[in-house]
Structures are given as C-alpha cells and as structure tokens.
Amino acid sequence: MECVRSGALDLGRSGNFLGKSGSTTSCGKVRCSTNLAGSTKCEQNLHGKAKPLLLSASGKARGTSGLVHRSPVLKHQHHLSVRSTSTDVCTTFDEDVKGVSSHAVEEKVGVLLLNLGGPETLNDVQPFLFNLFADPDIIRLPRLFRFLQRPLAKLISTFRAPKSNEGYASIGGGSPLRKITDEQANALKVALKSKNLEADIYVGMRYWYPFTEEAIDQIKKDKITKLVVLPLYPQYSISTSGSSIRVLQNIVKEDPYFAGLPISIIESWYQREGYVKSMADLIEKELSVFSNPEEVMIFFSAHGVPLTYVKDAGDPYRDQMEDCIALIMEELKSRGTLNDHTLAYQSRVGPVQWLKPYTDEVLVELGQKGVKSLLAVPVSFVSEHIETLEEIDMEYRELALESGIENWGRVPALGCTSSFISDLADAVVEALPSASAMATRKVKDTDSDMDMMHYLTKMFLGSVLAFFLLLSPRLVSAFRNTLQ
C-alpha cells in the first residue's frame, strides 16, 4: 500500500492540528473539508477491537465460482449482522429496524469503493503522510500510549516527506491512484447497468481526498436506500480494508441516517473466479513477450505488513495472500503454463520484523541462483501507484539487473480490465443485502486472553523504536549495519 512510500492517516481525535499545507477541521484529517457526525470519535475502541473473525461461506449462491474462501469480519460495537451471499461473506449493519421507514420507498442502490488515497501534488505529500501515520491501524500503539499517535505522526511525516517527495517526483509529481479509481468507478457503473442494476458509485479514500467521510455525506444527500461497500483490496488486512471499514463503522454507529440502511461489505474477494482469471490473463500476456516464456520465473510481490499483525492481532492477510497465489497458479496450470513461481513481500519500514521473505532479498538470491528471466506480479494492488511505478519498476528492477537477472518484465495492475470490472459488478449484485433479519455474530475480544503487561511492554517498546527509526532512511541503514 502507498502508506510505506508516502503516508498519511485517519485522524480520529477531536481537536485542531495545523499542517504545513493547511489546517484540519473537527474530522481530524489534514485539510479535510468535511465535518461529519462521528468523525471525532474515530480512535475509540480501536486497539484490539479490529481483530478479524474468520468465517466460511455457508452456501453457494447462483452464479458463483465455488472457489475456496475465507473472509474476515470486524467487530462492531453494537449489533453486527453477518450473512453469506455466494462465496463472499458480507457484513450487514442493521442496528435499528425502525429507521428503515425514514428512507424513501423507491430503491436507490449505492456502491462505495474504498481505497488508500494518495498525494496528487508534491505539496500534498507531508499532510498525506501525517494522515497515514496517525492511523492506529498502521502504527499500533497500546491505548495507554495512544495520545502519542498524532505528535509522532507529525514528527515522522515531517522527516520522511523529503524522501517521499523524491519518489513521487520520479513518477510525475503525484499519485495517479485517484484518477484510476475514478475510472474504475465509472467502468463499474457501466458494468452494473449492463447487468440491469442502476447504481450510484462513490469513492472514499482513507488518507487523502475524497475522504470516506465526504463520500458518506454524499450518500446521505442522494438518499441511498441500499449500500454495498467494496474495498479495492483483493485480500483483507487490518491495515487496509480493516482500517477503512473501521472508519465506516464509526460513522454508521453515530449517524441516525444509517440506523436502518442495509449495508453489505465485501471484505475480501481474491478468491473470486473472475479476479483469478483476470490475473492469469495478464500474466500469460506478459509471459508471451519473453523470448523464452517457459523459463521465466513468476515473481509475486505483495505489500508487506509487520509480523505482529499476523501473530498477535490475527490478521488473515498472509493466509489469504498464499491462497490467492495458489489459485492463480492453479488457473495458469490448467492452461498449460507450468512456470516456477515465488512470493515475497515489499515495502517494509523500520527494524521490526515484517512478513518474509522480503522482495529485495529474494531478488538478490534469485540472481545468485542463476535465474535470468523474471516477471514481477504486483498482487496486492489493482491500481498503479508509487509502489508499482517507483518501487517495483525502478528500485526492484535495478536491483534485479544488478543481481544478474537479465530479462525483466512486470504485469500491470488490473485497472479497468473489462473481465475484472465485470467480476466486481457480479460481486456487487451478489452482495446486495436482503430484507430478512440477520443473526448477530459475537466476536471474541482476544486482547482479554493476553498477558496485558507483556503485551503493553512489547507493543510500546517496539513502537517507540520503530517510530524513531522511521524518521530517516539513514538511521534505518545504520541500525541494520550494526546487526551485521
């Protein structure tokens, strides 16, 4: 995700903060133009409450792929209803059925696309980074020390902005993520119409314009009566889909308009047949460019997360990523493509352990083993942004060539690929909430089972060390050198 290369985040607390390029409103985000109900309480009940519950679909609905599925659901502070619609598990908010009467009788379907966001100009980089690092789902501090989140986010973003500016300058001066996401939204609207579903499409970004709060405000103005929420992350992680969904939950539980609004959330969709086949199509196309396609190593590079997210917080991201790769390779094998493949994780920051193996280290190892042709596949991303255009296309390509790899290729992000957009439209249709009542699922608070003093000590010391080593790439390099 763009968080490592740039960074800015959810500013859930009330209070004003002045950034370099502007001020905040009570919604807490740098230069945010909205002031929505509930936005000043974004940091309540966050740490330890976002542990996902792994659910299995209870049945297979018409038109589904039948592929293996695991999908997480975040804990909701009030009543959270969960249902299975096809292979995707959808979360439905239905806290106050009396509120349904306040909505118009005429059905108006809305689809909310959630994404990371990215700075559109170099002046946006520092406040974007602030928003990123202020997110408690990006840098997880114990509740006791969460008052440090915003000051440290300011410190980190200020020190990291010059380096991030260089990266964005190298790809044209800003992130193309918003433009591409808008194009995907338009394409999805057309695809839904072709499937006889008229829907209004909204885009809500986590760390830059248009913020999720702005999209929610427009949904209210448009009097939407059914809403499908679709994070544009194939695999679920606490730090991506989870963070965006948490913001949405906080808004929903505080806003009377949403009390009776049926909302279905598609938490992950990497297992969908349309997505898997679309990825296989792109890989096959890029393999054909090589003079020796059968000898090319397929190199899946996924965005990494700290190992503690998986071990301590129960993030299903690693399991879902491995399942995703297995499904794509199974599809390629069925087409006669039998290339070797490997998976590595990119974009780690600081001295803490992230998911391994690391992309940069694996590239060097492959070169040493004599691999000559490599096709990089950015599997966490459906849009081009700084981690594909700068980190993979520039940094990793250069490293690969220096390591002895002679032929380099890269699969583009899915973007507006017609088969991919069509499958997203199918997912939306399948996820539309039903009118029937749903059973509430209780999510266990796993923090209560942990040794609290051990947990607080581990998280605090690790977070403080990570914060200071995040400040400068030179500090990170110096720290690593002392370990060698």
UniProtKB/Swiss-Prot annotation:
Q: Where in the cell is it found?
A: Plastid, Chloroplast
For this protein, what is the EC number?
Answer: 4.98.1.1
Pathway field of the UniProt record reads: Porphyrin-containing compound metabolism; protoheme biosynthesis; protoheme from protoporphyrin-IX: step 1/1
On whether Phosphoprotein is a keyword of this UniProt record, the answer is no
Q: Domain of life of the organism in this record?
A: Eukaryota
Q: Any idea which UniProt keywords this protein has?
A: Chloroplast, Heme biosynthesis, Iron, Lyase, Plastid, Porphyrin biosynthesis, Transit peptide
Can you name a GO cellular component term?
mitochondrion
Decide whether keyword Cell cycle is in the record: no
Tell me, what is an example of a GO biological process annotation in this record? heme biosynthetic process
Q: Which GO terms describe its molecular function?
A: ferrochelatase activity
Can you state which reaction this protein catalyses? Answer: heme b + 2 H(+) = protoporphyrin IX + Fe(2+)
Enzyme type, top EC level:
lyase
The entry assigns this protein to a family as follows: Belongs to the ferrochelatase family.
What does this protein do, in the record's words? Catalyzes the ferrous insertion into protoporphyrin IX.
Q: Name the PANTHER family for this protein.
A: FERROCHELATASE, FERROCHELATASE-1, CHLOROPLASTIC_MITOCHONDRIAL
Q: What is this protein called?
A: Ferrochelatase-2, chloroplastic
